Every structure is written in C-alpha cells, then in structure tokens.
C-alpha cells in the first residue's frame, strides 16, 4: 500500500495481477470475483485489460486495495496507505477504505505518521516512539486532538 507505483508489476495486466492469487488458492469464479473487487473500489471491469502505467496513482492504489480484498481477509495491514498520493486522492482513498471496512467487517491495522489520517480512520490508536508504545488513544481523545505529537 505504501507505494502504489512499486506495488504492481509493470508488465502484467491488472487482470493477471488480480487473478493470480485466486488461481494459486484454487478459487472458483475468478472472473466474477475480479469484476466485483474492481467495482468495489470504483473501477470498471474493463480496467482489467490495462497495465499499471496506464493508471493514475489513485487508480493504482485502488487496484492494490482490490487485490487485498480478493482473499477476503479479516485483518488488513495499511502501511501509509495514502503517503504517495496528492491530498484530493488521499481523501477518496481513506473514505473508500472506511466504507470497505464496514461492508466487509474487517479490522485495519493502520501505520501512519499523519495524525489526521489516524483520527479519520481509527477507533483506537497507539503512539509509538523509538520502537515502543508511549500512549493509547480512544476515539474521544483523538477528536480532542490528544493524539498529536505537536
């Protein structure tokens, strides 16, 4: 997630990128699952014929999210999910991730240096410094801005 430009093989179509994990696991209805995953992240099914260089950064991030959802995880690690994106695309991706979390009843483990991203995405947070947890925050504390390191 951290770098959508490096996360996708440049010589593979999106179809190959998305279908491959399903084939490895012996899943059925691969075409339907790929189509559903793309639609869930706001991309048309015909995008599966494209290569990564034909997509914007936000579209690439959506493909990476779709790939993660294909295997129906209960827990998803989001490592700086918007760090390589401009501000308007960041908001779109964060809102999409929140929507998908609710729809799929997933838990996210979010890693971010951005206090606003943490507040927008989290019910609980832990502040780490020098490799150790320094403090925990709940939703109320984050709404009051107590999670900031200013």
Give the residues covered by each predicted segment.
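A short, surface-exposed alpha-helical micro-motif characterized by mixed small hydrophobic
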Residues: 118-120
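ABC-type ATPase nucleotide-binding domains, specifically the catalytic core motifs of the NBD
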Residues: 5, 12-30, 42
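Conserved ABC ATPase signature
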Residues: 51-55, 59
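Conserved ABC ATPase "signature" region
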Residues: 31-46
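Hydrophobic anchor residue at the start of the ABC signature
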Residues: 65, 93
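A short, proline-enriched helix->beta-strand linker immediately N-terminal to the Walker B motif
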Residues: 70-74
